[in-house]
Amino acid sequence: MIADVYIELKEGVADPEGEATLKALRLLGFKRVKKVSTVKVFRIDIEARSREEAEREIAEMCEKLLANPVIQKYSIVWRE
């Protein structure tokens, strides 16, 4: 089973990289861009007896290592 795990900042947390990218895009003439957010993606290939078991294990990975629960949130998208 393969999952894409998206790690992004929670609402209200400053995103200096996203803000700098937005500013640079506007300076390059891309005036219609409203917002740029930084998102990190981990592609995890995991062996498990069920999708539920794999999802529990990946959630534990996120809570223990991949995401900082104080300022980040995560979502899991399964690849078929």
UniProtKB/Swiss-Prot annotation:
Enzyme class, first EC level, given as a word: ligase
GO BP terms in the entry: 'de novo' IMP biosynthetic process
InterPro entries with a match to the protein in the record: PurS, PurS-like_sf
UniProt KW keywords: ATP-binding, Cytoplasm, Ligase, Nucleotide-binding, Purine biosynthesis
Reactions that this protein is recorded to catalyse: N(2)-formyl-N(1)-(5-phospho-beta-D-ribosyl)glycinamide + L-glutamine + ATP + H2O = 2-formamido-N(1)-(5-O-phospho-beta-D-ribosyl)acetamidine + L-glutamate + ADP + phosphate + H(+)
Transmembrane spans: none
Pathway: Purine metabolism; IMP biosynthesis via de novo pathway; 5-amino-1-(5-phospho-D-ribosyl)imidazole from N(2)-formyl-N(1)-(5-phospho-D-ribosyl)glycinamide: step 1/2
Subcellular location: Cytoplasm
EC number: 6.3.5.3
GO molecular function list: ATP binding; phosphoribosylformylglycinamidine synthase activity
GO CC annotations, alphabetized: cytoplasm
Alphabetized Pfam families for the sequence: PurS
Function: Part of the phosphoribosylformylglycinamidine synthase complex involved in the purines biosynthetic pathway. Catalyzes the ATP-dependent conversion of formylglycinamide ribonucleotide (FGAR) and glutamine to yield formylglycinamidine ribonucleotide (FGAM) and glutamate. The FGAM synthase complex is composed of three subunits. PurQ produces an ammonia molecule by converting glutamine to glutamate. PurL transfers the ammonia molecule to FGAR to form FGAM in an ATP-dependent manner.
Family of this protein: Belongs to the PurS family.
NCBIfam families for this protein: phosphoribosylformylglycinamidine synthase subunit PurS, PRK05974.1
Subunit structure: Homodimer. Part of the FGAM synthase complex composed of 1 PurL, 1 PurQ and 2 PurS subunits.
Protein name in UniProt: Phosphoribosylformylglycinamidine synthase subunit PurS
Lineage, uppermost ranks: Archaea, Methanobacteriati, Methanobacteriota, Archaeoglobi, Archaeoglobales
Gene this chain is encoded by: purS
